[in-house]
Amino acid sequence: MRTSISLVLVGLAALAVAQRAEAHPHILVDAHVKLLFDQRGDLTAIANVWDFDEAFSAYAIQGYDSKGDGNPTRKDLQPLADINMDALKEYHFFTRVSSGGPPAALGAPTDYWDEFTDEKMKLHFTIPLKQPVAVRGRTVTVDVYDDEYFAAVNFPADQATAFADEPAGCSNLIRRPERLDATIARQLAQIPVTQRELPADLHAVTDRLVNAIVVQCP
């Protein structure tokens, strides 16, 4: 069985138990995503800002507040960011880039840090691709999700596809998953925090809860 996602995110086995021990998902994430392109128009990296829910955030920052005023600095939180990146690597950062073949290989994260603002922890990080992905004449999809649904990763309502130096003439769309059926949601709510992997029938459902950015270029 893989490492608990609570360990992935904060390195504390007690975290999810203290917050949402009774239900999947245990952590809520709003993922803001920007696609980065080089001068040739190839996709080179994905820049991310993840906003965690307030309950999770309040617990996650405990022990990292050097001033004791409830507002840890970016410097305070850097050890936590190091833990985040090292552990999320096992899950490919909940990110998959594909263009019809096998998923693109991801490199080591760069420009990463945590901040605490507006009662939420925000994780900033950029994932470079080991090799640029050509987008001309093809459809490229960037999926962002946790297939085990321990963390519910969503594109926020105001998320618009954000490009940096994108090729001219490209179109894009945001694709969000359908709402969970109430019966499935109740079944997920009965799964304890200690169970990372879902039963096959439920995994078949959560594996479709994919947020995607779909890019098409002439």
What are these regions (language model features)?
Residues 1-5:
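Positively charged n-region of N-terminal signal peptides that target proteins for export
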Residues 6-16:
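Bacterial N-terminal signal peptides
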Residues 18-20:
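N-terminal signal peptide c-region/cleavage motif recognized by signal peptidases
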Residues 25-52, 56-58:
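Early extracytoplasmic/domain-onset interaction patches
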Residues 28-29, 89, 107, 208:
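Short solvent-exposed loop/turn micro-motifs enriched in small/polar/acidic residues
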Residues 55-135:
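Structured domain cores in non-transmembrane regions
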Residues 100-218:
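Mature, soluble, non-transmembrane domains
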